[in-house]
Amino acid sequence: MGYLIDGYKPTDDQFKNLSHIGISFLRADNIKGDVVMTDGWDNIDEVVSSAHKNDVKAIISFGGGSYIVTSELMGVKKNRQNLIKNIVRFMAKHNLDGFDCDWEPSWLDDKKEMESVNNAISHHYIKFIKELRIAIDAEFGKGEKSFSAAVMNANNIWYSDQKQISHFPQNGWWHFLDWVALMNYDNDLGAKHSTFESVYGPNGSVKYWNSFGVPLEKIVTGIPFYARAGWGEEWLFYKDIVKMNTNLSFETDFIMYKKNGLNEKEYGFNGKSTIVKKVQENKKLNLPGIMFWQLAGDVEVNSEHSLLRAINKNLN
């Protein structure tokens, strides 16, 4: 599954290498549960129609990393149920094939405030997941629409002073989902960003979430189509790295680069060889699939450097 933002419409060649697209993001516009899309999605129906013409499922993704979900929204039954009603209506209106819950921890400089905001996940996550599953099945028929969620590489905000902020509760919310996608990126910086070991190693994300309770048959791993050197603007699309390095080796997973006058740093990404290795490990573990953020970061799919092409070729 490839995530799309800002109205990005995949090419037909890209669609041929996809099973699902995640249209990002739908958000609550207020604590009453009214919903609105992020900027750029005036063409949502066109993108959904193109996906369906190519036998690709179009899923709506809710939330996102920069979006703050509050207890006033999720902890108040009337507001939560109004949100659920509006999500179901939105799915029906735009002929969507599923819902992806990308309710993430919120990054706030004030750690006490961050802990308070993110307590909404611990206290209300399963209420939202369970009630939305019931509503989706009631409206469209049991199993007619997919329901998934995206979670952190591990169950904490690793770079905060308090490493156990914003737990996803260990109360079985995954039983209501078809799959759980691990956001296996932004876990570290430079050459340590999204390494094979951080996902599949003995202390990696797959092992962590499986031990947490999520069965392997529901775990979808995540791959970045970008490089990360620091927080904020210190990132690069994979396609820009290829453009700047015409002789880029398939084995290369980081480059040294100075962006916008900042200090030269390691920009860590997943090169083609690492992508292939990850896909092969996924198949070895019988995991159901791979997702990536985001499709616009890849080169043209007919390029030998295309990550989408490498994933599809080795997954199928």
Positions of predicted regions on the chain:
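Glycan-recognition patch characteristic of GH18 chitinases/ENGases
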Residues: 1-91, 117, 191-201, 217, ...
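Glycan-binding loop/region signatures in secreted carbohydrate-active enzymes
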Residues: 17-18, 216-283, 301, 306-316
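Short, well-ordered coil/turn segments that N-cap beta-strands
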Residues: 17-19, 54-58, 95-99, 143-145, ...
